């Protein structure tokens, strides 16, 4: 592989050190290596902001691992940044001098505002959804809050609170008592209050989280079969569960890994304070953050207006998808959706996911015609899809699995991006669109009227269409039968 196409970003965080190595490909990035080590640098800061020798040694030890991988990458294509703990440490110079010797490249201590800007860029390049967003990143010793529209930030704040420093300050006795949480939340709200008005003034349509705490919450919710949206009610529920556990070493929540457990209560307290103070309705996990911001900054790639569209284009190119057919199916599915929207009330994000499934429905053919829906589902489940959340990927894979043949109803109920009933409705529309676009010509798609009454679908075709299309009639009869097996009434006239 040509080393000039390789880029590396290293983030010396207060809780963990991370390294990301990527290859530039098709105006996007392909991840080659991700290494993360819990160094807990912030835990080595004393009251005078002096970093202990033990904490520094943990950091250097980690960098020796990273250094081996960096040898293959040209130095101008490497960026190493240090964040909150090394901004605070009075003896940061000693740590950085040795770090630069180990890595063989410069280490830059970035300001809180620059960190916030880079986090926002990482989110803007990798996360789909509405343009106007609030980004929250809870680090080990600082928390970044950024509002912006598209690629432009409108306000940037880096606050002196993090999951490691709050752990040392409010959970140092390792007790998970109501008082510990109350103190941690109150302190976090006090830190937030001076910046809350400006953040609210700029406003947001979506809120995304880009930190280990949010990642941990996502893993917990997926493991427990909840939908992926983080809400204050879910956070309070998890807090009560933590309080029931009593002590940090006894913290057990389904889906919470041992690695994340130590700083989870402190991160949770900060997040509850953010939700409460800013009146956040819901939050989802960002597709990328600081490291992705560093990489995209080196590549000078413009932020795509629609990240999901770029992702779909790249995948269609890679798997030689017939885009005319994909568009034909999408147009038909959209037409069907408009006809039933008064009865089914399908939300815009669900519509977008249906159209994404239409664009990708034939990728399985690049493996083999036989079992193409299984291949399509497998590919979507395992491909990197910038702009789509893990739950959305799972829904897409499930729709593609059920695009034809008998329906696996349980798989539609196991995804958690949309309610099961909505997943069933999207699946029905996708199947009908694929069926009626089957001859791959616009002029051969009949005029179809679709009506919905609760879960009953009535499909009306031109008067003599069925008589003149015996194969089409056979396929429609088969589809009616398959839908009836899962109690989806389909009446064809």
Curated annotation (Swiss-Prot):
CDD domains: ASKHA_NBD_EcGppA-like. The keyword Cytoplasm does not apply. Disulfide bonds: none annotated. It comes from the Bacteria. Keywords: Hydrolase. GO terms for molecular function: guanosine-5'-triphosphate,3'-diphosphate diphosphatase activity. It holds the Pfam family Ppx-GppA_III. Its EC number is 3.6.1.40. GO terms for biological process: guanosine pentaphosphate catabolic process; guanosine tetraphosphate biosynthetic process; nucleobase-containing small molecule interconversion. It catalyses: guanosine 3'-diphosphate 5'-triphosphate + H2O = guanosine 3',5'-bis(diphosphate) + phosphate + H(+). InterPro entries: ATPase_NBD (IPR043129), GppA/Ppx_hydrolase (IPR050273), Guo-5TP_3DP_PyrP (IPR023709), Ppx_GppA_C (IPR048950), Ppx_GppA_N (IPR003695), PyroPPase_GppA_Ppx (IPR030673). Pathway: Purine metabolism; ppGpp biosynthesis; ppGpp from GTP: step 2/2. NCBIfam families: PRK11031.1. Belongs to the GppA/Ppx family. GppA subfamily. PANTHER family: EXOPOLYPHOSPHATASE, RETROGRADE REGULATION PROTEIN 2. Catalyzes the conversion of pppGpp to ppGpp. Guanosine pentaphosphate (pppGpp) is a cytoplasmic signaling molecule which together with ppGpp controls the 'stringent response', an adaptive process that allows bacteria to respond to amino acid starvation, resulting in the coordinated regulation of numerous cellular activities. This is Guanosine-5'-triphosphate,3'-diphosphate pyrophosphatase. It comes from Salmonella paratyphi C (strain RKS4594). The lineage of its organism: Bacteria, Pseudomonadati, Pseudomonadota, Gammaproteobacteria, Enterobacterales.
């Amino acid at each position: 592989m040509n080393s000039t196409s390789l880029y590396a970003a290293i983030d010396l965080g207060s809780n963990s050190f991370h390294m990301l190595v990527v290859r530039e490909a098709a105006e996007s990035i392909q991840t080659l290596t991700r290494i993360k080590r819990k160094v807990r640098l912030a835990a080595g800061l004393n009251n005078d902001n002096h970093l202990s020798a033990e904490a520094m040694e943990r950091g250097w030890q980690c960098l020796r691992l990273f250094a081996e991988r960096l040898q293959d990458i040209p130095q101008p294509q490497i960026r190493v940044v240090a964040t909150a703990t090394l901004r605070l440490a009075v003896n940061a110079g000693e740590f950085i001098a040795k770090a630069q010797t180990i890595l063989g490249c410069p280490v830059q201590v970035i300001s809180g505002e620059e960190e916030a800007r880079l986090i926002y860029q990482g989110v803007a390049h990798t996360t789909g959804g509405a343009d106007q967003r609030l980004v929250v990143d809870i680090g080990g010793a600082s928390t970044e809050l950024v509002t912006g529209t598209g690629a432009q930030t409108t306000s940037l704040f880096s606050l002196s609170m993090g999951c490691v420093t709050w752990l040392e300050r409010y959970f140092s006795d390792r007790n998970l008592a109501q008082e510990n949480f109350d103190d941690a939340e109150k302190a976090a709200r006090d830190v937030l209050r001076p910046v809350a008005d400006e953040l609210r003034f700029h406003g947001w349509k979506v809120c995304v989280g880009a930190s280990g705490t949010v990642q941990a919450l996502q893993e917990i919710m997926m493991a427990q079969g909840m939908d992926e949206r983080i809400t204050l009610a879910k956070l309070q529920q998890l807090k009560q569960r933590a309080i029931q556990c009593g002590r940090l070493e006894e913290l057990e929540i389904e889906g919470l890994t041992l690695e994340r457990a130590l700083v989870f209560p402190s991160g949770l307290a900060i997040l509850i304070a953010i939700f409460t103070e800013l009146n956040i309705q819901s939050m989802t996990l960002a597709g990328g953050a600081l490291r992705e911001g560093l990489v995209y900054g080196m590549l000078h790639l413009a932020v795509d207006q629609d990240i999901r569209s770029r992702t779909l284009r790249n995948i269609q190119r890679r798997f030689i998808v017939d885009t005319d057919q994909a568009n034909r199916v999408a147009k038909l599915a959209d037409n069907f959706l408009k006809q039933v929207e008064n009865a089914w009330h399908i939300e815009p994000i669900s519509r977008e996911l249906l159209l994404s499934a239409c664009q990708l429905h034939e990728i399985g053919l690049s493996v083999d015609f036989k079992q193409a829906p299984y291949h399509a589902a497998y590919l979507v489940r395992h491909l990197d899809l910038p702009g789509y959340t893990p739950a959305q990927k799972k829904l897409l894979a499930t729709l593609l699995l059920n695009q034809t043949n008998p329906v696996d109803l349980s798989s539609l109920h196991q995804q958690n991006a949309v309610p099961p009933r909505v997943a069933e409705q999207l699946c029905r529309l996708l199947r009908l669109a694929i069926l009626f676009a089957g001859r791959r010509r616009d002029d051969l798609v009949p005029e179809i009227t679709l009506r919905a009454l609760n879960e009953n679908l009535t499909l009306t075709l031109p008067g003599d269409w069925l008589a003149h299309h015996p194969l089409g009639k056979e396929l429609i009869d088969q589809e009616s039968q398959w839908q009836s097996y899962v109690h989806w009434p389909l009446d064809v006239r």
